[in-house]
């Protein structure tokens, strides 16, 4: 298990005893019988309603998530899907189960299924608690029997990351065929950077292993101030000679940060900041985006976020000011931004749960057009929108406001949302 924001519990007095006691209590449950995202209730009890409102989080009922996944992912074995706002993992659960059921039907071995599902079903969220729970939900969807079978090591592909990439709207971490990850802890006048040659990111599992080993060597079994050789690591992981100087510099930076007492989760930080950037590379785009974006209203956004939201919305033909300004929310921009960044250009499909206002209200007029001007590095993002699901008549309401489900595909020519 990698170090993250929550591993402090094993470093405090009696922390290991607490973990063992908790594990015994959790073991009382029959986790083989799980048929839905059981952790969303835990998330909603840990994160206050006020905080969830500020984040625009409204959790999707499992029956709806299952129906959306069945519609959006008809061929799970050959479809790479991303939930860019995965929360506790509701959509991920049903995508994993759908993939494994198809794998069983196709006669795939357990190892083939686990390798395939972790390649084809990916999640991302901005909230570290949600990401931790979503990773557990992902494993529950796989199930204890599959996890106990003979298999290769797996890394759960659920990442802590800013899917919107607000900070990179005008810039990127990529520079001259390198990934440059800033330390960004506000403790240096000149910001240091971890540098990784682009060639090392082609294989996500190999990159994760490299970062994990660098972080482990920097934080364990090393005398203060020492910079041990890592030639064996270069050999074991087949690091090309031309990439070794950058990796050496990155390792020395990790050692310095550890010696200065500046956190010990740099490996976790690098992997999770790198993953949105990696997914945004054209060669890594997914076939389907599915999920429930944040429904954060403009009037509830912080001022600096309001300014960025307006600027990015105007550039994509989504801003409708005057009487509509306070009624706009993040969901439309989030969906368009996710399509720009992560969806393959020809035929990539989307399926998102959104407020029902998207169907006919003025603040969503630009979204319903299917043409989003100024998107990313192109003049226009064109989307052919399909007939939506209008859930306004569903009772009881499962969100504070009524909902819909929007479907569409990237296309050469836009098709407005059918009325």
Identify the function of each model-found stretch.
Residues 1-100, 120, 124-130, 161-171, ...:
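Preference for the N-terminal adenyl/adenosyl cofactor-binding alpha/beta module
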Residues 18-23, 45-48, 115-118, 157, ...:
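Short acidic (Asp/Glu) and glycine-rich catalytic loops that position anionic groups and cofactors
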Residues 35-50, 106-114, 260-268, 302-317, ...:
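Active-site-adjacent bridging/hinge elements
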Residues 58, 107-110, 324, 328:
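Flexible, glycine- and charge-enriched loops at secondary-structure boundaries
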Residues 63-64, 93, 100, 126-156, ...:
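Signature of N6-adenine DNA methyltransferases within the class I
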Residues 101-105:
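Post-Walker A helix-loop "phosphate-sensing" segment adjacent to the P-loop in P-loop NTPases
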Residues 106-133:
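Cysteine-dependent PTP/DSP-like catalytic domain, specifically the C-terminal lobe
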Residues 179-219, 412-419:
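Extended, charge-rich low-complexity interaction segments
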């Amino acid at each position: 298990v990698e170090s993250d924001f929550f591993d402090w519990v094993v470093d405090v007095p009696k922390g290991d005893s607490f973990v063992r006691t908790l594990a015994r209590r959790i073991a009382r449950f029959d986790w083989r019988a799980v048929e839905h995202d059981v952790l969303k209730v835990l998330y909603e009890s840990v994160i206050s309603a006020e905080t969830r409102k500020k984040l625009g989080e409204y959790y999707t009922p499992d029956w709806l998530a299952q129906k959306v996944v069945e519609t959006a992912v008809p061929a799970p074995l050959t479809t790479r899907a991303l939930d860019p706002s995965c929360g506790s993992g509701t959509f991920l659960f049903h995508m994993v189960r759908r993939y494994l059921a198809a794998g069983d039907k196709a006669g795939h071995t357990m190892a083939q299924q686990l390798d395939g599902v972790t390649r084809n079903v990916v999640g991302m969220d901005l909230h570290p608690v949600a990401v931790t729970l979503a990773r557990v939900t992902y494993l529950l969807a796989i199930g204890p029997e599959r996890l106990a079978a003979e298999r290769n090591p797996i890394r759960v592909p659920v990442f802590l990351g800013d899917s919107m990439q607000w900070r990179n709207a005008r810039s990127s971490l990529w520079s001259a065929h390198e990934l440059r990850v800033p330390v960004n802890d506000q403790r240096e006048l000149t910001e240091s950077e971890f540098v990784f040659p682009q060639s090392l990111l082609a294989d996500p599992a190999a990159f994760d292993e490299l970062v994990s080993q660098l972080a482990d060597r920097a934080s364990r079994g090393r005398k203060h101030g020492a910079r041990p050789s890592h030639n064996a690591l270069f050999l074991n992981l087949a690091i090309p000679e031309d990439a070794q100087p950058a990796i050496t510099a990155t390792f020395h930076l990790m050692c310095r940060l550890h010696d200065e007492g500046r956190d010990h989760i740099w490996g976790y930080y690098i992997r999770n900041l790198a993953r949105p950037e990696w997914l945004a590379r054209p060669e890594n785009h997914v076939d389907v985006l599915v999920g429930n974006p944040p429904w954060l209203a403009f009037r509830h956004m912080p001022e600096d976020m309001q300014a960025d939201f307006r600027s990015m919305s105007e550039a994509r033909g989504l801003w409708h000011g005057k009487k509509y300004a306070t009624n706009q929310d993040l969901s439309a921009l989030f969906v368009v931004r996710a399509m720009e960044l992560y969806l393959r250009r020809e035929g990539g499909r989307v399926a998102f749960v959104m407020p029902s206002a998207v169907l006919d209200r003025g603040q969503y007029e630009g979204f319903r057009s299917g043409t989003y001007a100024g998107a990313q590095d192109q003049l226009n993002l064109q989307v052919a929108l399909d007939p939506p699901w209008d859930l306004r008549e569903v009772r009881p309401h499962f969100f504070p406001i009524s909902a819909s489900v929007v479907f569409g595909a990237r296309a050469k020519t836009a098709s407005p949302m059918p009325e």
